[in-house]
Amino acid sequence: MAESRGIPVPGRLPGSTGRVMMAPPNRARTIVVALGGNALQPPEGRGDIAEQFAHTRASLDPLVALAREGWRIAIVHGNGPQIGDDMRRNEAARGELPPLPVGVLVAGTAGWIGYMIQQSLQNALDRFGVKRDVVTVITQVVVDPDDPATREPVKPIGRTMDEATARLLEAEGVPVRETRAGWRRLIASPRPIRVVEHAQIRRLVEAGTIVIAAGGGGSPVYIDPRLGIEGLDAVIDKDRAAQVLGGDIDASEFVILTNVDGVFRDFGTPDQALLGDLTVAEARALLDEGALGAGSMAPKVEAAVAFVEAGGAAAHIGRLEDGLDVVEGRTGTTIRA
């Protein structure tokens, strides 16, 4: 039974819901979507599961729109607030239960956040009659154990806190730093090299399945010559992990959906200006000049530039609710070679 969205793929994957798997008509159109934390919960929210489910359901229209347009999709999500909460649970249970290492906490958040996105997106696709399955893959991401970043806590995670709370944590040996939004704890964040499960993810995506992978950047691992794959106590930036995944699965496009309209020169100042189209050279010049301002935009632009330099057609950065318009260049920032 052929439909206008694509051609049924023979057979059924293990665990399939029974839907006919649909291959999008243009096999070159593969996109990796990096979802910011605002897709899961509002910044000032309570953070309980009911609120996160409600916010996730309300945030998925852009992904449904991409699916309806026939894009092959891999989704990478952040987990900053959630991993911070889990680290606080470790501290609260000190003396009662053995603490879980950070790589295990990342895998745990990837599981339950993936479940939340998977269920919510599958329901939304079904409502629109889009015959695509959604699955979550717990993902390991290879890093270099000798990367200096494995020993230098620089990445903010968890919820913001007041200075008094931050100073108490600092006195206990927890690295903290003041950010624009407030005080945050810090953790080591090495650069990703490759996704261990990339071949499995690629096969699923090529079959038309929407894959949620590298959740929270994926669990960092390294290759021990004697033991094989071993975990590392750190986190990976989700935008950089998404960029690496895009190269591993040969995606043509990469989009980072966040809570700002795109890349601004002099962001946060009276002279800020939205930059709609950039070449890789122009984007690199902005990074070198420090013209993107303080905050989290520079790592996003670095990831976008790396994706295009590795052979991707284009990388986009824009507001979550404008998803399809960002990908099609009507709003946000697009970076090309």
Label the model's feature ranges.
Residues 18-337:
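C-terminal catalytic "cap/lid" subdomain
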Residues 1-21:
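N-terminal amphipathic/basic-hydrophobic helices that include classical n-h-c signal peptides
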